[in-house]
A protein has these predicted regions:
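Periplasmic binding protein-like
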Residues: 48, 409, 427-460
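Extracellular/periplasmic solute-recognition and catalytic clefts
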Residues: 165, 175, 231-242, 269-326, ...
Length: 460
């Protein structure tokens, strides 16, 4: 089978900023240095523009295997495993916890699973917490305790989907309930990423088996054991989550244990326009903005000094995908030419103001042993990150394209950073005779082009 797309790998992650709006009299200290009040208060609401603030939910049904599922249902549905936040840097621990779906092994804790053990290399046993309940959901289910059959149902449901990604759980043979609170995973082969693929990944939030009798794509039917339930959804506007006061978990602060959650409501605000987003941060209509482009940070710090900040390296990376099933992009020389024609270091220095890394994708330094620095890679890889337009022209000539060629490149208008960056990349390509036409697209059309494999020769 021919591959439909291949990455150019123009750049790795830019540094992101998170802004938290406190009251005007709040001390201007970083979040990790803030001292919690001695008596945490219950109630109120949070208005958040998340990392995906420009996008509404794509699907509420796990069987659709959409990449954004856990973002939209993560406050409602829980996982077997999760991160132990007591090991966060903000609490004196070693971990930043800013990586996308990566939890270091020494920071792994049970969420719905109370404990787990390997009976042999192909048999993993998880014992579920007792006293964890699904709340009553009219039209879906009565209140009842989570049990092992729910876990079995969940994995059978997502694995039987026609949209299943077999590479994610292909190593899994079957799942069985040994008793009411014991689940056994039988593997075809051992996979070292078992904790992510079975425990805390994108596609394994636990559902009640009553979902088999309702429309899983209807947001009104979404339910889980988590600290919130979704109570309102208006596409392109807001997703509201209301506290589940029957939630099982707690938080120890000082010497006192508090039931969770503290807040009554969380609103995910969908804000497609960057100017509107920045205005909402300044005026307090947003309590948290999870991603602020660095170009906007200095002005926000000046106009709204009460904002508290944190920063991290974005895990997604910035790259251009190419169709390699048609000429001339099926030619390796052409793809290498496109790569070395772009001055990546100049983009880091000038476009991102130094707040980016040339090589930190698909693995970032915080991924530990997974990460291999560019300096340790083969010379053929290192060459792709050195700006050399003269060699790029020679490669095109060697590929039979001395005069260059034309291509179309698609970009989602939902990503201001890409909209601003792409003309710069196109200008680099023009210097070697590659004439690229930029095609901005709304997200629905952009996603449809990707999933139906009708996308242009390139997209970012």
């Amino acid at each position: 089978m021919k591959r439909k797309a291949g990455p150019v790998g123009i750049m790795a992650g830019a540094v992101c900023a998170l802004a938290v709006l406190l009251s005007a009299c709040a001390p201007r200290t970083p979040p990790e240095a803030m001292t919690p009040s001695p008596e945490p208060q219950y109630g109120g609401e949070l208005n958040i523009a998340t990392v995906y603030a420009t996008l509404s939910a794509l699907s509420w049904d796990p069987a659709d295997w959409v990449w954004k599922q856990n973002h939209d249902t993560g406050a409602v549905r829980e996982l077997l495993l999760s991160a132990d936040l007591s090991k966060a840097r903000s609490r004196g621990g070693p971990h930043a916890f800013t990586m996308d779906v990566f939890v270091p092994r020494d920071a792994l804790r049970g969420e719905l699973a109370e404990s787990w053990e390997w009976e042999d290399p192909l048999r993993l046993v998880m014992r579920l917490r007792r006293g964890v309940f699904f709340p009553e959901k009219p039209g879906v289910m009565k209140r009842r305790e989570l049990d092992a059959e729910d876990v079995v149902y969940t994995f059978n449901y997502v694995r039987s989907s026609p949209r299943v990604q077999p590479t994610v759980m292909g190593f899994l043979d079957r799942v069985e309930a040994r008793d009411s609170h014991t689940v056994v995973f039988h593997l075809r082969e051992y996979n070292n990423e078992w904790d992510y693929r079975l425990g805390y990944g994108y596609y394994n939030a636990i559902l009640p088996r009553e979902m088999a009798d309702v429309d899983a794509r209807d947001w009104r039917n979404v339910t889980g054991t988590g600290p919130f339930s979704i109570s309102r959804y208006v596409s392109a506007s807001v997703q509201t989550y209301t506290a589940n006061r029957d939630y099982w978990d707690s938080e120890e602060i000082g010497q006192t244990t508090y039931r969770l959650p503290f807040v009554d409501r969380i609103n995910y605000r969908i804000v497609k326009d960057e100017a509107t987003f920045l205005s909402a941060l300044r005026t307090g209509k947003l309590d948290i903005g999870e991603v602020v482009r660095w170009i906007n940070v200095p002005q926000l710090k000046e106009t709204t000094p009460e904002l508290q900040w944190n920063r991290w390296l974005a895990p997604q990376g910035t790259l251009i995908a190419l169709r390699v099933d048609r000429p001339p992009l099926d030619n390796r020389l052409v793809r290498r030419a496109l790569n070395i024609a772009v001055n990546k270091q100049e983009i880091v220095d000038l476009f991102y103001g130094g707040e980016a890394e040339v090589m930190a994708f698909p693995q970032l330094p915080d991924f530990g042993a997974y990460f291999q620095p560019l300096g340790e890679m083969p010379a053929s890889v290192q060459e792709l990150f050195v700006y050399d337009p003269e060699k790029a022209r020679r490669l095109l000539a060697e590929a039979g394209l001395p005069d260059g060629f034309e291509l179309n490149i698609q970009v989602c208008s939902c990503t201001p950073d890409h909209m601003d960056l792409l003309p710069l990349i196109v200008s680099y390509w023009e210097k070697i005779g590659v004439r690229a036409r930029i095609q901005p697209m709304e997200y629905a059309a952009f996603l449809s082009a990707m999933t139906t494999r009708t996308h242009a020769e390139a997209y970012i």
